[in-house]
Amino acid sequence: MLMTAAADVTRRSPRRVFRDRREAGRVLAELLAAYRDQPDVIVLGLARGGLPVAWEVAAALHAPLDAFVVRKLGAPGHDEFAVGALASGGRVVVNDDVVRGLRITPQQLRDIAEREGRELLRRESAYRGERPPTDITGKTVIVVDDGLATGASMFAAVQALRDAQPAQIVIAVPAAPESTCREFAGLVDDVVCATMPTPFLAVGESFWDFRQVTDEEVRRLLATPTAGPSLRRPAASTAADVLRRVAIDAPGGVPTHEVLAELVGDARIVLIGESSHGTHEFYQARAAMTQWLIEEKGFGAVAAEADWPDAYRVNRYVRGLGEDTNADEALSGFERFPAWMWRNTVVRDFVEWLRTRNQRYESGALRQAGFYGLDLYSLHRSIQEVISYLDKVDPRAAARARARYACFDHACADDGQAYGFAAAFGAGPSCEREAVEQLVDVQRNALAYARQDGLLAEDELFYAQQNAQTVRDAEVYYRAMFSGRVTSWNLRDQHMAQTLGSLLTHLDRHLDAPPARIVVWAHNSHVGDARATEVWADGQLTLGQIVRERYGDESRSIGFSTYTGTVTAASEWGGIAQRKAVRPALHGSVEELFHQTADSFLVSARLSRDAEAPLDVVRLGRAIGVVYLPATERQSHYLHVRPADQFDAMIHIDQTRALEPLEVTSRWIAGENPETYPTGL
């Protein structure tokens, strides 16, 4: 089954973020931009591994660089296991608990310290020659390493540096456990941890290239100046200059048909994202591109990040079936928060267009284009839809389904989260067996049900089968919600991928012409490839990644971005829809780079090789979901991404406006008061 297989692949695969130490240093430098051009800043790299990282930081900040030598004190017979550290100046830090636990004698500890002390002096002489260490008294010292594990070496460095009485001590590393970063936050003036992988296995797991740094490389880096007017490098503007030459005009976020045709090619699956769930231009441009793909390229379905039964009600409407008389009614099934995500003016107009377009074809025929959902939040609604279907075709099977699904009645009605909590913590039964049995029962009788009424019956059977699959996957998902964020996220995206695959198979079965082609509508966080983002280090996967692995060149992904404007979002989960001001993008972000490039454009390394270099750099990328928290924007809405690998193309619209819900509240109309933003005072 896809879920198990994908989970196994995730555990076996390396979870890298940075190409090498130099790239990690460039990422850190962007996060340390506040220290740029400050005359009292000195960058110290912990030798040897921290020097390539530190050189990039120092060069970007236009600050002097020096090496600080720290030697790990390894346990007897196990040199790689640190029991402490020795820093320049003779400062020794020892983990007393480890020393006692390993029964290391004082004499053994002295022998280890003396041996490492000799190596420390040798390295200082090799790196610096006769030159004395840089005077850091009264200075702001940024201490850089290639990562932290236990933090013993960094702790020894901090203790030794304090003796020199610097004005401030700042620690900056590309990767470290969250617990270690928090520990140092209480010891120094500032801590910058670019990534905090969970679980944290080793520093080297965050790098594709983690080869050992040599003494010669350290000497070469120290001999290469990092400060001085002639050395200042406008890296971001240079990247923007390159992008200006290759950016393709896309008014309103919509490229020309020729550009879109070249980008899509013969792909069967085109995933079109959004960097927020509440931006009008993202929805409008996506709808316009989808209309052209349906009309001119034979795409036969939209598969959205929406619940299966609610989306299928829309599918019936656009095919001229069901009882709804207009698009507003067809979308009324979307009642769960956030309703505006699909109950909005853009989706309403698209649904009405799709119904009008489909009327040119025979009602119910698969030459019509459909509208489907990929998500799994519809636990109880899907249960009701399975039973409703079986009541019509097999009353005895419906009775069996009622008996099995009664297991879910122990939790609050329509509350999958309450079921998950009860099952996870033993406060209620797990309904896993019942959900699986019912899915098997529906699948076992599928052929008999399909023969009862031809093609239309087979469509409804497929609908029922997917509802049963959704119940089974939602049951697992809601239990997993209370065991970890990554686990539940992966289950959700694996379910989306499974549903997409089943939909392709279903549509293929009835096409005489070329294979079925589907447009996917979902957030960038699902559409993009997780392997090109820092969440990959946590073991997280995405729909876009799974689709690429399964379908290769038969798939394309398009991401959206914006620099500023307004967005429809809530301030908390389940909250009211608000029209909120979007802050200008952070320094060092993809959005800032695009802001420096043009107003509305498409850029793709597939269409222009020159676009690859500026996009093949780790930068911050913004992701606004249904909740937007400007006060904690860096922590809540940004992650490190490599755009060249995350998407096949990106479309940037510099200033955007909030998506209009069908049910507009007075608070949404009022928006935010710019005079009091963001303090609210």
From Swiss-Prot:
Protein keywords: Transferase
Keyword Acetylation: no
InterPro entries referenced in this protein's UniProt entry, alphabetically: Emycin_Estase (IPR007815), Hydrolase/PRTase-associated (IPR052036), PRibTrfase_dom (IPR000836), PRTase-like (IPR029057)
One cellular-component annotation, GO: plasma membrane
Cited SUPFAM superfamilies: EreA/ChaN-like, PRTase-like
Molecular function as annotated in GO: transferase activity
Entry keyword Transferase: yes
Xref: Pfam families: Erythro_esteras, Pribosyltran
Domain of life: Bacteria
Biological process, per Gene Ontology: response to antibiotic
Induction entry: A member of the dormancy regulon. Induced in response to reduced oxygen tension (hypoxia), low levels of nitric oxide (NO) and carbon monoxide (CO). It is hoped that this regulon will give insight into the latent, or dormant phase of infection.
Family membership noted in the UniProt record: In the N-terminal section; belongs to the purine/pyrimidine phosphoribosyltransferase family.
Name of this protein: Uncharacterized protein Rv2030c
Organism: Mycobacterium tuberculosis (strain ATCC 25618 / H37Rv)
Lineage: Bacteria, Bacillati, Actinomycetota, Actinomycetes, Mycobacteriales
